[in-house]
């Protein structure tokens, strides 16, 4: 290989005489025997502060699609394929993570083998990733940690690229479309905190609780856990048939043992998925979800931090990283005890979700008693909530504002034909397509099943023009939010008894609120004093509870009815419209997921 190109001396070999990774100072030209490609300017991390990676799950998917296509291309079949990157330490770390993830997912390499290949030759070390806080980095997350997180997620079935929909992932992670991501399929969804009313505030789109109802019900979300101060009435969720819990602790801080214990108890006794939010849905939310995954799936602190950031970039911040490191041993012991007790129980007692914990301070009765119990014994005392209110702009506010300033992507690089989306099989965490039919009664918590498709092959990446529906994604943030505002009845699912095989666009009713969008909106100010989150020291927790916040006077105590009037300007999360490909589009990812996908680990 060195004889063919002196530049490839020291390149990392992943497939002998076939796939290589190299760090080069200059952009090389492909030759008759070598094909070069780079993704440094194509797959770019959207940072909050000094954070620069790892790249999210959709970008990992797109990279794997791209590389699989090259490896299966007839025109490149006799060439060595070289993924090259620059000496920019941040881009280089992300590029190494991508090809390492490919090696773990498709080449059946262990994380250690993939990382060893990355270190071979004359390659310098890789810059470790950091958190999204303002201030000095106090916790290093290495490329190896991220590969180990990918491996654990694959082992436990947390993702499956045969059924993954990158368009839906990228659609719903946008702040104007809900700002949420699945962390554990069918179990945990992390999202930004709802607001009393759907509106745009300082350029940031805010969504009322009712905007999430159709999606939550469709995806079997039965429980909401709020970790921030109360800015909406929990009654709006409970009246719609959801369970709702309040486990407040200060923005940017770490939870007390009591809060962790009660969060785990709630999750272990909940049937269905749990939607967890704080203010931005990043720090506090990621920390508690991480505790559950460490206990029940035996992730290390580094593995779960890596996995959650791959699913939802910016999660787990500052002292929360060190908190998880400190809690790892005790959570593993708790998990071992939990599984031991479960193993010794008679099989007739049911699954994990039906096991009743012995905590004396938890009520598992009706909705009202649950709310009263959690509030009575909660950590969310007046002093802590008042402190968060007095601080005015908190870490969560800043992170949400920064995320809202991101420009919408022009057109997704992986489009799907509408025919391919008919009855497309999805993993448990996959999202749904809305139809124009009204939804059944909002009180039922049963969800219709997703149709299965004989085709599980991935779709060809397309750089071409998309259909008019997909072109909606190229509009400005105001146009996108305007198109998603309308009557709550719009865009809900078909009744379970009516099965449809065609994809229909959701009908959105125009609202007078769109006239506001056409005017000038204030850009989020960035002249606020920065919070050095890494210098935060935990304060002692109080056992007193709080029943309201300083913003309570502005809350709507009654839920918005289904037949919402246009002037109420209620937001509903719209679907992402698939693009189109020609009928001759190539399917190139068949049989690409190795047998590792079925290797579930039982502890």
From Swiss-Prot:
Residue ranges annotated as compositionally biased, kind Polar residues, are 518-538
* Catalytic activity, EC: 3.1.3.16, 3.1.3.48
Feature: compositional bias, Low complexity: 539-558, 573-583
Region annotation (Disordered) maps to: 518-583
Query: What's an example of a GO molecular-function annotation for this chain?
Result: protein serine/threonine phosphatase activity
Which enzyme class, named as a word? hydrolase
| Location relative to the cell | Nucleus; Cytoplasm, Cytoskeleton, Microtubule organizing center, Centrosome; Cytoplasm, Cytoskeleton, Spindle; Cell projection, Kinocilium
Entry annotation: catalytic residues:
278 (phosphocysteine intermediate)
The Phosphoserine modification is found at: 484, 592
Q: Does the keyword Nucleus apply?
A: yes
Q: Which residues form a coiled coil?
A: none
Q: What is its main location?
A: nucleus
**Which family is it part of?**
Belongs to the protein-tyrosine phosphatase family. Non-receptor class CDC14 subfamily.
User: What protein am I looking at?
Assistant: Dual specificity protein phosphatase CDC14A
Annotated source species: Mus musculus
């Amino acid at each position: 290989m060195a004889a063919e190109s002196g530049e490839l001396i020291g390149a990392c070999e992943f497939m002998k005489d076939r796939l290589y990774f190299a760090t080069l100072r200059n952009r090389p030209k492909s030759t008759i025997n070598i094909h070069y490609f780079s993704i440094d300017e194509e797959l770019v991390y959207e940072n909050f502060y000094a954070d620069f990676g790892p790249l999210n799950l959709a970008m990992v998917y797109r990279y794997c699609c791209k590389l699989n296509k090259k490896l299966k291309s007839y025109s490149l079949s006799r060439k060595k394929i070289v993924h090259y990157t620059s000496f920019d330490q941040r881009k280089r770390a992300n590029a190494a993570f991508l090809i390492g993830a490919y090696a773990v997912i498709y080449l059946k390499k262990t994380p250690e083998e993939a990382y060893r290949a990355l270190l071979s030759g004359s390659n310098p070390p890789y810059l470790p990733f950091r958190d999204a806080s303002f201030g000095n980095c106090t916790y290093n997350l290495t490329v190896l940690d991220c590969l180990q997180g990918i491996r654990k997620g694959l082992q436990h079935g947390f993702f499956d690229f045969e059924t993954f929909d990158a368009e839906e992932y990228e659609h719903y992670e946008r702040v104007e479309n809900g700002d949420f991501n699945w962390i554990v399929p069918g179990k945990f969804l992390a999202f930004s905190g709802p607001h009393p009313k759907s509106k745009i505030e300082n350029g940031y789109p805010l969504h009322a609780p009712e905007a999430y109802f159709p999606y939550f019900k469709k995806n079997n979300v039965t429980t909401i856990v709020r970790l921030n101060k109360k800015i909406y009435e929990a009654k709006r969720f409970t009246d719609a048939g959801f369970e709702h819990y309040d486990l407040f602790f200060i923005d940017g801080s770490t939870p007390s043992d009591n809060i962790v214990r009660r969060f785990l108890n709630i999750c272990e006794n909940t049937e269905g998925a749990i939607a967890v939010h704080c203010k931005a849905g990043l720090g506090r939310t990621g920390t508690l979800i991480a505790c559950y995954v460490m206990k029940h799936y035996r992730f290390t602190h580094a593995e779960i931090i890596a996995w959650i950031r791959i699913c939802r970039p910016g999660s787990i911040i500052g002292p929360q990283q060190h908190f998880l490191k400190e809690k790892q041993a005790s959570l593993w012991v708790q998990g071992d005890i939990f599984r031991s007790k479960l193993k010794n129980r008679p099989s007739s007692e049911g699954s994990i979700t039906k096991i009743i914990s012995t905590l004396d301070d938890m009520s598992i009765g009706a909705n009202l008693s649950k709310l009263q119990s959690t509030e009575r014994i909660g950590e969310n005392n007046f002093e802590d909530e008042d402190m968060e209110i007095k601080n005015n702009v908190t870490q969560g506010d800043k992170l949400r504002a920064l995320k809202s300033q991101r420009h919408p992507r022009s057109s997704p690089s992986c489009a799907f034909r509408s025919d391919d989306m008919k009855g497309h099989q999805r993993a448990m965490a996959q999202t749904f397509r809305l139809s124009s039919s009204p939804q059944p009664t909002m009180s039922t918590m049963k969800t219709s099943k997703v149709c299965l498709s004989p085709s599980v092959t991935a779709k060809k990446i397309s750089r071409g023009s998309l259909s008019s529906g997909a072109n909606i994604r190229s509009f400005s943030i105001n146009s996108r939010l305007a198109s998603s505002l309308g009557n709550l009845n719009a865009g809900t699912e078909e009744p379970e008894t009516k099965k449809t095989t065609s994809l229909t666009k959701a009908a959105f009713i125009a609202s007078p609120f769109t006239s506001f969008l056409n005017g000038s909106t204030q850009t989020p100010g960035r002249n606020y004093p920065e919070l050095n989150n890494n210098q935060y020291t935990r304060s002692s927790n109080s056992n007193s509870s709080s029943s309201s916040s300083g913003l309570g006077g502005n809350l709507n105590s009654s839920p918005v009815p289904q037949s919402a009037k246009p002037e109420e300007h209620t937001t509903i999360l719209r679907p992402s419209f698939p693009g189109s490909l020609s009928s001759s589009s190539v399917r190139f990812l068949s049989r690409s997921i190795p047998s590792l996908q079925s290797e579930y680990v039982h502890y």
